[in-house]
UniProtKB/Swiss-Prot annotation:
The keyword Ribonucleoprotein applies. It comes from Neorickettsia sennetsu (strain ATCC VR-367 / Miyayama). This is Small ribosomal subunit protein uS2. One of its GO terms (biological process) is translation. GO terms for molecular function: structural constituent of ribosome. InterPro entries: Ribosomal_uS2, Ribosomal_uS2_bac/mit/plastid, Ribosomal_uS2_CS, Ribosomal_uS2_flav_dom_sf.
């Protein structure tokens, strides 16, 4: 993570414009502790000294989830975010919602799962029976498939609720934040000066409108996921090596035990054999000694 943390600096944040908030009349009072001041244009300035540690904490949380085989969901449906959200989520092998948040995505996950199953069914139908279906039937099925793919294509392989979500503009994505909050799913979000950070688990104070800022945040999050996945892979490989070493040690110990047992048995058998050889002579001598004893005449 150190290489990622090296990119999280006040200088880099300033260069992408992360310090530029909204006009003062649009501010949310709950963001007051993250505001440095006001510009001449009556725009709030974000305190980047606070953003740096909070961003690093958020990236650590995301990396930890990925390192434990968790699912990370990228959420950003505003025009300037949708393409980047999809690109970066795909790059790190995670999931995304980038066009419209399906209401009940989390709280009614069973319905979403059924829609994903329909998508798979339509694809198989077109692939296996496309030649048999009429043109009208193919067009109808394809329209249904495209509609589901458009809104749920980014979560079709998620296989369950995410373990953490990353949100660009929680004010716009308030439904996603509310659903995650109800189900106890941690939320990482970039909070601008007009946002309410009260339901954000890991808030990142900063500009959530600038294209450069969004690219910067999403790139860092995707890299944090990749670091987590790499960490998990290394841990598994290390565990496999340890297991093999333990197995080898157990085999050696078992083999040594067998050899020791065989040696003890051989020694015992030899001692018994010697005892048998000596025993008849001793018995004969006892009989002779008994014959020499004077008879007790009473």
């Amino acid at each position: 993570m150190q290489s990622i943390f090296d990119r999280v600096t006040v200088k880099n944040l300033f260069e992408v414009g992360a310090h530029l908030g909204h006009k003062t009349r649009f501010w949310n009072p709950k963001m007051v502790s993250y505001i440095y001041g006001t510009s001449n244009a009556k725009t709030h300035i974000v305190d980047l000294q606070k953003t740096v540690p909070m961003l690093r904490t958020a990236l650590n949380a995301i990396s930890d989830v990925a390192a434990n085989s968790g699912r990370v969901l990228f959420v950003g449906t505003k025009m300037q975010a949708c393409d980047i959200i999809k690109e970066e989520a795909t790059r790190c092998g995670q999931y995304y919602v980038n066009l419209r948040w399906p209401s009940g995505m989390f709280t009614n996950w069973n319905t979403v799962s059924k829609s994903v199953k329909k998508l798979v069914h339509y694809e198989k139908l077109l692939e296996q029976e496309g030649d048999v279906l009429s043109k009208k039937e193919r067009l109808s099925i394809n329209r249904k498939r495209e509609r589901i793919e458009k809104y749920l294509g980014g979560v079709r392989k998620m296989g369950g609720l995410p373990n953490i979500i990353f949100v660009i503009d929680p004010k716009k994505e308030h439904i996603a934040v509310e659903e995650a909050w109800k189900l106890g799913i941690p939320v990482v979000a970039v909070v601008d000066t007009n946002c309410d950070p009260s339901k954000i688990t890991y808030a990142i104070p900063g500009n959530d409108d600038s294209l450069r800022c969004i690219e910067y945040y999403c790139s860092l999050v995707a890299d944090a996921v990749l670091v987590g996945i790499e960490s998990e892979l290394q841990r598994k490989q290390s565990k496999e090596l340890d297991d093999k070493a333990d197995e080898k040690a157990a085999k050696v110990s078992h083999s040594d035990g067998q050899k020791k047992g065989a040696s003890i048995r051989a020694g015992t058998d030899k001692a018994a054999l010697q005892k048998r050889k000596v025993s008849p002579k001793s018995e004969k001598q006892d009989n002779v000694d008994a014959a020499k004893l004077p008879e007790n005449k009473g």
